[in-house]
């Protein structure tokens, strides 16, 4: 009986150790493997593909099919490097994000301008206070928590970059 229990413990501990292995490309501190991976992709690109990687195109997740098809064509034939999402809905955006990534030979950089959260661009999402309001708060810990939550929300829908915060000059009283 003791041998059976010992064998089971050994089996379960082996499975637990193997389950903790990970992809080195997904580990933030494994820069060398990441550099090698990027280098291997880049060295196999044509000049046209390298130039295409410099461009990001804007699309609304609520755009008509024709516009989405044009972006798909740019991904497949001009090898664009990324997408900047604008207005639309979260469900449609995640679907488009997945469709676009599946079409691209190289992972696309997905971006959005969401200064005060996803609600700045997407319907039915949580809105945070605008930057002018945040600037009036004296407790930096609150500001940090809000920024962290906005980052978590944008990451959850597949964004790599949030073009925020920005420095705006407030000269238009109709747009504070």
Please state what every model-predicted region is.
Residues 1-23:
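Bacterial Sec-dependent N-terminal signal peptides
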Residues 20-176:
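N-terminal beta-rich core of secreted/periplasmic extracellular enzymes
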